From Swiss-Prot:
GO terms for molecular function: structural constituent of ribosome. This is Large ribosomal subunit protein bL27. The keyword Ribonucleoprotein applies. Keywords: Ribonucleoprotein, Ribosomal protein. It comes from the Bacteria. It comes from Kocuria rhizophila (strain ATCC 9341 / DSM 348 / NBRC 103217 / DC2201). One of its GO terms (biological process) is translation. The keyword Ribosomal protein applies. The gene is rpmA. Belongs to the bacterial ribosomal protein bL27 family. GO terms for cellular component: cytosolic large ribosomal subunit.
Length: 84
């Protein structure tokens, strides 16, 4: 049995890129329309008032206002309270 695998063969080199997921704007912070609030895999947080959801489940603001986290029907939701 060879104890070397031969020319240009390796068992390493499989590191994946970071995904940079998580909450980007926290409760009480001011945001503008279009700003990303949460990057996530699946719907850990659900979109609430003045919030949109992208195809990769990213939550973003549809209007300028203040971020607010809460619950609705047992689900974590994110709302944007606009200054009306």
């Amino acid at each position: 049995m060879a104890h070397k695998k031969g020319a240009s063969s390796t068992r390493n080199g499989r590191d994946s890129n970071a995904q940079y997921l998580g909450v980007k704007r926290f409760g009480g912070q001011s945001v503008n329309a279009g700003e990303i609030i949460v990057r996530q895999r699946g719907t850990h947080f659900h979109p609430g008032l003045n919030m949109g959801r992208g195809k990769d489940d990213t939550l973003f603001a549809l209007a300028a206002g203040v971020v607010e986290f809460g619950t609705r029907r047992g689900r974590r939701v994110v709302n944007i309270q606009t200054a009306e």
